Amino acid sequence: MWGRNGKECIVVFATGNANSSISFPANCDDRILTVGGSNSSGHRHSTSNYGELLDVVAPGTEIPTTDLLGRYGSDNKGDYYMNFGGTSAACPHVAAIAALILSVNPNLTRAEVNSIIQSTARKVGGYNYTNTSGKTDGTWNREMGYGLVDAHAAVLKAKQKL
């Protein structure tokens, strides 16, 4: 976690795809920003892990990506593209938002970046988000965390802290 001249590195980690409580390695440090997956309807992806350690969700279904052809790849269509899913597909969205935040305000600490991502997440899916003890960045839900990440809102909030 150390780095950035004492501001700490932002670490995002996928919660896992077992449709159960978050476990190792996503639960090994409370400074990790844990990311679950959401589907195109704004609900928790059916296999995305959940629970007290969940911070946010990001799109985790039908994410286009590049791939290899042949026996080392999964691309059967021959066009170098395939769809990727699960919490490992959701996690890069959050890492990219953290990078965008730091591109407009590189003086933010890890804790501030995590807080911006969590506090600007959208409450989607019809879930009941409530004030929860220990969750200081707004209302929270055990299946969706603080909600679906919102890159635009996060960058705007980072700019306000300049």
Model-derived regions: residue spans:
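Catalytic-core segments of hydrolase enzymes
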Residues: 1-67, 115-121
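Hydrolase catalytic cores
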Residues: 60-144, 148-149, 153-156, 160
